[in-house]
């Protein structure tokens, strides 16, 4: 029996494993889900043991545990480290899910559940492939280490210290990330760059308590009004960030990615139809849209609060209002510099009568890139090209996968993104799904990849 045949025959069991994994509510940002975090870590550890990883352990990180496993086939063989994460985004808003987020639902060739695409489905694939090699051939063609963290969706605040602490254990020739995404379902792609991240909350306070809007209206400071003015000052008419110093250090984009954008023939009108924008297209060309998504920094408002939120009306002037902000960074930008620029901008524009509080979430991460001449990158392209019948595009990712720069800094090695989710699968949104055809494709691809890397 071949490895490929084993995977085909055991696909039903693999699908049940994925469903069981997705039933675990492993939300990393909310302490209410801490039991789910520990259950998910235990699930991954047990699945590694079942796959034949002789050494499996929980690594203490100072936060949620990371799961580590290894199979050393031969010290003379190259060693690869598979990266993924078992934590997921919060499922809110729950009312927009067609089925409960932690009750996996299979329909129309897709599996719907929170975390199924980001990253439980993709990270399970290399584990299943390793198991197939062990069951069929009794060994792997390469040495394989696995590191699955539990804080990626929280910005990986303890990831860099964990790499430093366990540097010798994690030492490898190359990282293969199961996290990431194909750009589009109809075009094979490999991500060669991703944006960095800086996140913060801002809170504006006026009076010491909520006030009656009749008695105090017109004279008391209203934090919602002040907050709204501050937020609106952070972008220009074209939607680009207008915060002074925000762009400090930013470098020009890689011309090879611009070439990929030109070759993509991206349809901006179709994109806006897909996401449900019906009031006209804010950006008229696919080229400009992708440049903004991939190669320009952003400052987005993720949440806003203040005052009465219940049904009906309440005549109140709230004493506080706030917003959640995340910034995506391009090459050359530093999270510390970006946060400092935003802080200065807000403090300079804060109206009299208000106090401003800024809470930063973690250290953030810098943008990342892959050496375009890396041999493993070319091997990955060859594998996808053979399986899908067309050469994959080298694309950038507007999102953030902070592991690339962290692995380069602390382990001295590069990371290749070899994931089989696609960017349209609604991760971070209601009704997240994973194409089961990609679940199968990923198993074939990882099998080929490990063999090709062993022969390189």
Predicted regions and their residues:
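Active-site metal-coordination/substrate-binding segment of hydrolases
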Residues: 77-148, 441
